[in-house]
Each structure stands twice: as structure tokens, then as C-alpha cells.
A protein has these predicted regions:
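N-terminal alpha-helical targeting/anchoring segments
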Residues: 1-134, 149, 153
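TRNA-recognition modules of translation machinery and tRNA-sensing kinases, especially anticodon-binding
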Residues: 27, 130-428
Length: 428
């Protein structure tokens, strides 16, 4: 959410930003919110004047009574009563205007970083860099579900019976591999100085509205019927929510956190063959990294976060690349974002396995996350997030890049201690 003062003084910058995000339908909202803000400030000015006048007249009532000037006293009382009535009306009006302004401000997108390429959707994202050499083996690589079934590691039919489409049973060595990857991700981030958390898996609507746009919420989140609770789509939501209405001393920054959680998403719509199996599902587990920092440090942390993802995947012998997300592909709260994509030797292309974002002070402004400074007073923090790893999708990249011709799976050195010392998962 933008600062209303910034919008008031820079309406053309805000409008240009909206155009760059290809959201022209929101352009009228800028002028509308400016008019509402003007009306709100005029009402506040009138209310301040009335309070000053009321206080001045109220002081005279006692004087009039002491002087026996009852008529003057009654006249003053009537003026005070009239002012009180108008003040009550103004207060109600201000509350209504504040709500209208907030609703509009919540849908006006954040100002993107100047380095973000202008583009309409993800097809116009720009490759930044490749890490590791993508390879295609001499043998044919099966679909990831077929690989898992050959290892007796997945049961989709049973999951459809118990839960419907978009769910899975992992078992045996594949289930163990799934857990091993998450355990390794946890320790990988702890070794880089991040504090490990297991957060609540449900959050209230106040937090939901603070961390994401309404449209994102509608498309992603499951609501608990009869409760003011939503199942989280990522632990970023509950971890950023942890700081709601908090003032953090500058000396305690940055806050660098890594969190594990199951995640739940609607994933509405039909999907092609490449998004079936365990690629696009309603329930999965994820290790996340979150940073709360001073504004001047946020871009440095942004670069550190995506580099963490690259280093993690390369430690597991998976080639990756980074993509700069274009303006039209950025969610409304994001200032800048890059996707981390893993190489698929079966498809001979990269696919998304994580996303790193800086949101400026958008989430902090919505949730009241401020920094305490002796020199600057209290000011809003910056927040960032990035995926460490999200199996089972990451399993697709892992299995394809570590598949042997006989169907067995190589276990990289980094994971073996989490797999009981195994170096290979054998075909059953």
C-alpha cells in the first residue's frame, strides 16, 4: 500500500506505474482517492476549528454564570451543543472516508523498481543468468510420476479416492527423500545465519489482507468456514504476520528467518499434462526465507536471498537459472522479483521452483511494522521473501537430474546423511 502523501504529490508517477503494469482499469482510482483525501482533510480541518471554538466558548460559560449573565451562558451552551453535534457528524464522515480511501489504496499497485523490465506477462520475463550446465542424457527420461511409480514411491489413485485431484501419497524412499530435502534446506539456512521457525498454519483475515492483495487471496486461499481463519498458502504469510503492529529497534535488524510449513492452495483452473502429477497441487510443504530490514538494506538482501536459492540447488547438482520478472508479472505489492527455475532434461527447458521478492514497505505499511530510530523517529520497515525449496515440485527437477539409465536415483553427497547414508535409491 502506497503512502497517501506520496500519491497526493506524485499522481502522475502512480498513474505511469499503473500503465506499466497494464492495469489501466485502475487509473480512475488515482483521481478518485485524491478527491476523497481532499474531502477527508477538509473535514479534519473543520473539526479542528470547531474543537478550538468549542473549548474557547466553554471557558466563557463559567464566567457568564459567575457574572449572572444567564442568557449569555445559555446562548454559549447552545453553541457548544451545536458544535458537538456537527463534530459527531464530521467524525462519522471521516471514518467513512478513511474506509473508502483504504479500500482504494489497497488495490493501487506498489511502485516497481526502475530496473524492472516492462512487459505484459511472464512470457516477457528476462533471463538474468544460468548456473550449472544443463544436460540431456543419452537415454529417454520418463514423466516424473512414472519415475516415482517405478521406485514404488507414489500412489495418486489412493489420494484421488481420499481427497480428489491435486493430492498424493508419497511413500518409501521417495517420501524419505522428500523429508531429507526439507531437513537439508532447514540446516542450509540455519548455517547461513537464519533463525528456524515452525509458524501457525492458519492466519486471520487482518494478516491475509496485510500480506497480499484481495485478488491473490481469492485465487489462492482456503477459508475455514465459520471462523476468521485461512489456511496459509506459504509460511511467508504467518511469518510476516508475526510482526503485525510491532516497533522493532534498529539495533535488532535485520530479522532473518527461515520457516517450514505445509502450504494449501486452491490452484483453480485446468492444467496441462506437465502440471499434473505433483507439479501443481493443493497441498505441499515448503521451506521459506524471510527478511525484515531497514529500507537502505533491502536490495542487498534481495540479492543475497536469490543467491541462497541458487547455491542450494547447485549443492544438489541441479542446474538453474534466474529470471527477472517483468512489470506485468509482478503481484501488486511487489517492487522487484526474480524467479529461480530448475533445468528439466526431460522437457529440455527450465521450470519455476521458487520466487524471490522485495515488497518495499507495502506489507509493513498494511500491518504496522515499524522501525524505532533515535535520529529518524519511527518509520516503516522493508520486507522480503524467497523460497528455499518447495517439494514435491522440486522433486521433479531432482529426479530428472539425478536419474540413472536403469531407473535408480543418485543421492548427492549433501543429502546422504539425511537418507541414512544411502547413495542410490534402487528400482523396486
Amino acid at each position: 500500500m502506497l503512502d497517501i502523501k506520496f500519491l497526493r504529490t506524485n499522481p502522475e508517477i502512480v498513474k505511469t506505474n499503473i500503465k506499466n503494469k497494464f492495469q489501466d482499469e485502475k487509473l480512475p482510482l488515482v483521481d478518485e482517492v485524491i478527491e476523497l483525501d481532499k474531502e477527508f482533510r477538509e473535514s479534519k480541518t473543520r473539526a479542528e476549528y470547531l474543537r478550538s471554538q468549542r473549548n474557547s466558548i466553554s471557558k466563557k460559560i463559567g464566567f457568564y454564570m459567575a457574572q449572572g449573565q444567564k442568557d449569555e451562558a445559555e446562548k454559549a451552551k447552545a453553541e457548544v451543543a451545536s458544535m458537538a453535534s456537527e463534530l459527531e457528524e464530521l467524525s462519522a464522515k471521516e471514518t467513512e472516508l478513511e474506509e473508502k480511501i483504504r479500500k482504494i489504496m489497497l488495490v493501487i499497485p506498489n511502485i516497481i523498481d526502475p530496473s524492472v523490465p516492462i512487459g505484459k506477462d511472464d512470457s516477457e520475463n528476462v533471463e538474468i543468468e544460468k548456473f550449472g550446465d544443463p544436460f540431456v542424457p543419452s537415454f529417454e527420461i520418463p514423466y516424473h510420476v512414472d519415475i516415482m511409480e517405478k521406485l514404488d514411491g507414489i500412489d495418486l489413485d489412493a489420494a484421488r479416492k481420499t481427497s480428489g485431484n491435486g493430492f498424493y501419497y508419497l511413500k518409501g524412499d521417495i517420501a524419505r527423500l522428500h523429508s531429507a530435502i526439507l531437513s537439508y534446506a532447514r540446516d542450509f539456512m540455519i548455517d547461513r545465519g537464519f533463525t528456524y521457525y515452525i509458524p501457525p498454519f492458519m492466519i486471520r483475515s487482518a494478516v491475509v489482507n496485510g500480506v497480499m492483495s484481495f485478488s491473490e487471496m481469492e485465487n489462492m486461499m482456503y477459508k475455514i468456514e465459520g471462523e476468521d481463519l485461512y489456511l496459509i498458502g506459504t509460511s511467508e504469510h504467518s511469518m510476516i504476520g508475526k510482526f503485525i503492529d510491532t516497533i522493532i529497534d534498529e539495533a535488532d535488524l535485520p530479522q532473518t528467518l527461515t520457516s517450514y510449513s505445509p502450504c494449501f492452495r486452491k490452484e483453480v483452473g485446468a492444467h496441462g499434462i506437465e502440471e499434473r502429477g505433483v507439479y501443481r497441487i493443493h497441498q505441499f510443504e515448503k521451506q521459506e526465507m524471510i527478511v525484515v530490514c531497514k529500507p537502505e538494506d533491502s536490495m542487498d538482501w534481495y540479492n543475497k536471498l536469490w543467491q541462497n536459492s541458487v547455491d542450494f540447488f547447485r549443492s544438489l547438482d541441479i542446474p538453474v537459472r534466474t529470471l527477472e520478472c517483468c512489470s506485468g508479472d509482478l503481484a501488486d505489492l511487489k517492487v522487484k522479483s526474480c524467479d529461480v527455475e530448475a533445468w528439466s532434461p526431460r522437457q529440455k527447458k527450465y521450470f519455476e521452483v521458487g520466487s524471490c521478492s522485495t515488497l518495499g514497505d507495502a506489507q509493513a505499511r498494511r500491518l504496522g511494522i515499524r522501525i524505532k530510530s533515535k535520529e529518524k523517529g519511527n518509520y516503516f520497515a522493508h520486507t522480503l521473501n524467497n523460497t528455499v525449496v518447495a517439494p514435491p515440485r522440486m522433486l521433479i527437477a531432482f529426479l530428472e537430474n539425478n536419474l540413472n539409465e536403469d531407473g535408480s536415483i543418485r543421492i548427492p553427497e549433501a543429502l546422504r546423511m539425511y537418507m541414512g547414508g544411502k547413495s542410490v535409491i534402487e528400482v523396486k
